[in-house]
């Protein structure tokens, strides 16, 4: 993809909202112009945080200007980075929280991903043999995030999520997951999907409980 973009003179911008903090990304190797990430997912920062990492030679124009605080007496917005892209008062406490999350992930190394991926792999293995359970995506991919989307006997995903919480104390996400076009492609635009997101914070016992709960609901 990066090679094609380079040949056409296009910028290659990677959306790492779901992968930042989970999967190693080499911006230089991928020849990325920019990488965009959310802070509140696998980087464990506060909600409302995120950022853009710029590659060499890429300088986007700011979408908003004014109130930088660094050059208050200047009638124009600063041009030095990162001030050029940071208009108004910055979310200092959010940035501090994001920094703490990034440091936590760095200290863990690859442990967080390997544990979470192991949980997801075991969950998928058990779900494959359950009649009435439909799994979505390439569940056999060698490298995938520890997120599993499924449906149970064609029932509304919100109903299944409510039962999982009320009867089993298991928290999942139901609905379209901000991807309505994907659900249209899957044919699930009316019922959505139930999303299990595994983490290194989860225990083997919790994974076992999730497996048992889905099996029971699928009967």
Residue spans for each PLM region:
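Pyridoxal 5′-phosphate
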Residues: 1-219
């Amino acid at each position: 993809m990066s090679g094609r973009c380079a040949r056409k003179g296009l910028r290659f911008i990677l959306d790492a909202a779901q992968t930042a903090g989970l999967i190693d990304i080499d911006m230089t190797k991928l020849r990325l112009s920019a990488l965009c990430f959310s802070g509140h997912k696998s980087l464990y920062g506060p909600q409302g945080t995120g950022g853009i990492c710029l590659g060499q030679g890429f300088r986007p124009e700011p979408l908003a200007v004014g109130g930088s605080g660094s050059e208050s007496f200047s009638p124009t917005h600063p041009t030095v980075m990162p001030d050029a892209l940071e208009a108004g008062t910055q979310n200092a406490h959010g940035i501090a929280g994001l920094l703490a999350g990034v440091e936590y992930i760095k200290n863990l190394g690859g442990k967080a991903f390997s544990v979470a991926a192991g949980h997801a792999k075991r969950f998928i293995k058990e779900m494959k043999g359950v009649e009435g359970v439909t799994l979505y995506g390439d569940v056999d991919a060698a490298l995938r995030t520890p997120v599993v989307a499924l449906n149970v006997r064609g029932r509304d995903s919100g109903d299944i999520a409510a039962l999982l919480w009320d009867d089993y104390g298991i928290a999942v996400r139901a609905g379209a997951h901000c991807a309505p076009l994907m659900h249209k492609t899957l044919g699930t635009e009316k019922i959505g999907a139930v999303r299990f997101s595994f983490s290194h914070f989860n225990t083997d016992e919790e994974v076992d409980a999730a497996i048992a709960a889905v099996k029971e609901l699928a009967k």
